């Protein structure tokens, strides 16, 4: 039995939609680590200054670097993805994005694979747009397309269901509730 208790927190500027702060706490079986990014926008160019701190059992490291304003952490990237114009995408289209992971920026893609109806454990049904992100091969995933993200097919584009094939099995995440959306929840189907 392998226990994973990861927490991800991100703050994004409402005005600029740029990341401001990110923190993660990873607890995976006996492994643990904490990462923090503090972003500074000097407003003069296309880059953000990042103060990065990484704490793990072996010690703490701190560094500073600049990244493009197009790059951001995992949670902020998910928010940016919610703002894609899915209506203009065709099956097989790839939206490019830049992901900051630890102190490296990865140029990745999000492939639109079509639309599907999804039924969750609680019996609720959703119309979804399905995306397969390009993944960073490593300890967790065998292949670069082992993750599927099902996003509500409405103007909110909130994640409904996530399915991941991992080296040690399978992980799923599903929506339990959602409130305070900007638009009507038209992606949820009537029972």
Q: What is the predicted role of each segment?
A:
Residues 1-41, 86-191:
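Acidic, serine/threonine-rich low-complexity disordered tracts
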Residues 41-101:
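Active-site/ligand-binding surface loops and adjacent short beta/alpha elements
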């Amino acid at each position: 039995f392998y226990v994973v208790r990861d927490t991800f927190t991100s703050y994004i500027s409402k005005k600029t939609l740029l990341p401001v702060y990110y923190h993660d706490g990873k607890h995976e079986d006996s492994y643990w680590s904490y990462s923090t990014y503090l972003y500074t926008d000097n407003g003069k160019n296309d880059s953000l200054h990042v103060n990065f701190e990484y704490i793990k059992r072996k010690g703490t490291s701190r560094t500073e670097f600049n990244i493009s304003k197009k790059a951001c952490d995992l949670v902020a990237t998910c928010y940016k993805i919610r703002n894609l114009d899915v209506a203009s995408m065709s099956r097989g289209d790839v939206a490019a994005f830049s992901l900051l992971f630890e102190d490296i920026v990865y140029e990745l893609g999000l492939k639109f694979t079509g639309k599907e109806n999804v039924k969750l454990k609680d019996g609720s049904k959703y119309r979804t747009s399905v995306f397969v992100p390009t993944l960073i091969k490593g300890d967790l995933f065998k292949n670069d397309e082992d993750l599927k993200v099902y996003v509500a097919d409405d103007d909110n584009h909130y994640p409904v269901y996530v399915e991941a094939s991992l080296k040690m099995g399978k992980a799923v995440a599903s929506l339990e509730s959602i409130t305070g959306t900007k638009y009507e929840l038209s992606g949820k189907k009537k029972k």
